[in-house]
Regions:
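Immediate N-terminus of the mature polypeptide
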Residues: 2, 20-433
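Bacterial N-terminal signal peptides
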Residues: 8-16
Length: 433
């Protein structure tokens, strides 16, 4: 009995170390990999890799002796299918697609796959049976290209990163097939594997407040997120209210994101509305508007107690970027207006509770940025592809704030860069207010 408990504990601890990673690669062919800057990650430490492999082999051999530990092992562990860290390479997918650059995009076929392997364990097979596949039109509306467009390798890689960023897609593959009848055309196959999107959440807060929540990031296969949180007191199980959240990641194929949340949590309440679009292409625009009406308790240090604060916030912004081919960078300009109005708060003065002052602010920014995505799995290192951005962003920001008691001018600058170096992926950030 003691040995069984030890095996079970070892299994759970090892599973925690891999963060319950469980991703299946959709049968991607392994092309030649390009390593920018000769990057070789720390995972090339052979002794460490062999020691870890011996540990996992030992756990596997011990858990195979009994049915329950064997089921837990198969449920929590998976052998990586695609592991770029083991050979020290990072993949520049855009370079592999260069032979097709400039050709005309022909037919685009969408292939959808279940989140789990059909040959997996009982839990995975049951999950596939209860899962509703993402609708084809949802994936198609997330494409940055259409039939008749010129094939752009960088745009295709950027689109793969966009699809992978969706909570309802675990992995995606783009297969380019030259047209047999027209040498100037290429047909494309988009393979997308769904994610398991149903999750349960819970939280324990002070004063006996407890929250349980249920969410689905792909409700009815639409790609939309629905989350419902119920609050109650764990002291007497009295009802404390519900909070409902809903998010549409791509409204009618416009790449606008809309989100909404409303409800109450005992004495706290919220109403949030948002509609926004971000920079996606090198030449693009962004625009957004958010409004919130929130009542919540805030801790007052000088009073050593929490008091209710009610505030309304409005935030409006927009911007434009343009790609300059000669410097392989985009120049951008942005503007932003925001205000905060407090209808319930503790006493305030010019130097007392400044965070609770009513204020308006107007900011303008401009600068340059360059962005390119490489494919690797060094972040998690368990067979899941990541799209890591390299490049830089330099920005100058200026603006003015009209406060309840005083006005202020703002001037700041920032520079950030990230890329692959000899020791790994390095990211640097500099800001000056």
């Amino acid at each position: 009995m003691y040995r069984r408990i030890c095996i079970l504990v070892l299994t759970l601890l090892a599973a925690q170390s891999v963060c319950f990673a469980r991703t299946v690669n959709p049968g991607m062919r392994a092309p030649d990999r390009v390593s920018p800057g000769g990057f070789s990650p720390d995972s090339l430490n052979t002794a460490t890799s062999e020691r870890n492999q011996r540990l996992y082999d030992s756990i596997q051999s011990k858990t195979n002796r009994r049915a329950v530990p064997r089921m837990l092992y198969r449920m929590l562990f998976v052998k990586p299918v695609l592991d770029t860290t083991m050979n020290g390479r990072v993949l520049d997918e855009s370079r592999l697609l260069e032979p097709y650059a400039g050709k005309t995009v022909g037919d685009i076929t969408i292939e959808r796959m279940m989140p789990f392997d059909s040959c997996g364990n009982w839990f995975e097979r049951a999950g596939n049976k209860t899962h509703m596949l993402t609708r084809e039109r949802v994936i198609r509306r997330d494409l940055l290209f259409k039939p008749g467009d010129k094939f752009d390798p960088q745009l295709v890689v950027r689109n793969k990163q966009l699809l992978r960023s969706r909570p309802y897609i675990s992995d995606t593959e783009v297969i380019v097939v030259p047209d047999s009848l027209d040498s100037t055309r290429v047909n494309m196959v988009i393979r997308a594997r769904d994610s398991w999107t149903i999750s349960i959440d819970a939280g324990i807060h002070g004063e006996g407040r407890t929250m349980v929540g249920l969410s689905d990031a792909n409700i009815f296969g639409t790609g939309n997120t629905l989350k419902i949180k119920t609050n109650f007191s764990r002291r007497d199980f009295s009802y404390g209210g519900n909070i409902v959240e809903y998010k549409i990641p791509n409204v009618l194929g416009t790449f606008y994101t809309a989100d909404f949340s409303a409800g109450r949590d005992f004495y706290n309440s919220e109403l949030n509305l948002g509609l926004r679009k971000e920079f996606i292409r090198p030449t693009d625009y962004e625009i957004g508007l958010t409004y919130s009406d929130i009542k919540s308790k805030r801790y007052m240090v000088d009073l050593d107690t929490s008091l209710l604060v009610k505030v309304r916030n409005l935030d409006v912004w927009g911007g434009k970027s343009h790609y300059i081919r000669s410097i392989k960078s985009s120049v951008f300009l942005t503007g932003r207006y925001s205000y905060a109005r407090f209808s319930r708060r503790p006493p305030v003065t010019a130097d007392y509770n400044p965070a609770l002052h009513d204020h308006d602010a107007m900011l303008f920014g401009g600068g340059l940025y360059r962005e390119k995505f490489y494919t690797a799995n060094m972040v998690y290192g368990f067979g899941t592809r990541e799209y890591l951005a390299t490049g830089y962003k330099a920005e100058l920001v200026s603006g003015y704030s009209w406060g309840e008691f005083n006005d202020e001018m703002y001037l700041g600058m920032s520079y950030q860069t990230g890329g692959f170096r000899g020791m790994g992926y390095i990211c640097l950030l500099y800001t000056s207010p």
